[in-house]
Amino acid sequence: MTSKPINLKLLLESKNMERCPFPIPTGWYFVDYSENLKKEEVRNVNLLDQEWVLYRTESGAVGMTDPYCAHLGAHMGHGGKVCGEHLRCPFHHWEYNTEGWCKAVPYAKRMPPITTLQPIVRTLPVQEKFGLIWCWYHPALEAPSWDLPAIPELTEPGYVPTRRGTWTADTAIQEIAENGVDFAHLKFLHGAPGIPPAEVTFNKHVIHIDMANGYIVGDGYGPGLNVFQFTQEGVTATMISYTQAITREKSQMNMSFTHKVYPEGSKEGAIAKKLVDHMIGGAEGEESAGFESVDFVVWNNKKYRARPLLCDGDGPIIQYREWFKQFYNEAPKLDAA
């Protein structure tokens, strides 16, 4: 046995490490594509570590509400119906608007007084942008503190229809996001020819990354949205990543890929297609492996090391974690009564 001092904590702490020791972070989250939710449809969705009822009213507005009626706790996603602009509970036909206010109790001579003062079921703020349904999550029900950015590639003409992909990982959303600043893993896990140079800046809820001298440039907006442009020979393709926190230990990665319309058979069109293939990891002659084939093996089996042992060649992992902490907010402590 060596006589030198031994850091036993370093050697033994892995036994007590957790896989995903985080709550659900605050932010905007993708729920579904707008085209998938029809008028007057009522559907149950699992997101943000619980079940929700998602529905679209007669006018087209989207509501996302806690499933359980404030009356006697009936699940409004099983037998509930849209009545005009309201979601109607199947049990006694109490009706709620998209903000959680009770608007009708058909057999009540006098509405419960609290129904005139506040919402009585929890709902999430919802936006539809870029053909996607988004919800805002905050554990203490605080209003959105930032808005979704403009993404012209999804709203303006002149771009090819998006290619979409969906992948599920058994890990927390922070672990997936942290990959974006772990530049060394691109060489050693993905097999890239080298560790790319990169610059990272943090500004409030936005992280900006410029990698490989402008080859990959983009921004992350909170925990649930990233927009990156890949540029080669003056041709740019865009990857929009909108990851969902399904539970504390399961995340679903959703991505859209697009580029400008180029003439059929043109050099620019071929470059754009190869850039998109590179993003997915399926480009012909690709030197590095795509994330689907290598990252998931790590994510699905690793534990989170809160005090990592880093070297001078690692990316700004600690700075990233400090920035990400702003998205963790405490839920209110409720009385047991």
Give the role of each language-model region.
Residues F22-I24, L47, P119, E128, ...:
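A generic structural signal for short, non-catalytic loop/turn and secondary-structure boundary residues
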Residues K4-M17, Q50-W52, H86-L87, H93-N97, ...:
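A broad, low-specificity signal for short, low-complexity segments enriched in glycine/proline
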Residues E13-C20, P113, A150-T155:
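Intrinsically disordered, low-complexity boundary segments flanking structured domains
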Residues P25-W28, E40, V121, F130, ...:
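Sequence-level motif detector for i,i+2 pairs with an aromatic at +2
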Residues M1-E51:
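Zn-dependent metallo-beta-lactamase
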Residues C20-P21, N44, P125-Q127, T243-A245, ...:
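A general structural signal for short secondary-structure junctions and capping/turn motifs
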Residues A61, L141-A337:
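C-terminal catalytic domain of Rieske-type non-heme iron oxygenases
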Residues F30-E153, A337:
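Rieske [2Fe-2S] iron-sulfur-binding domain
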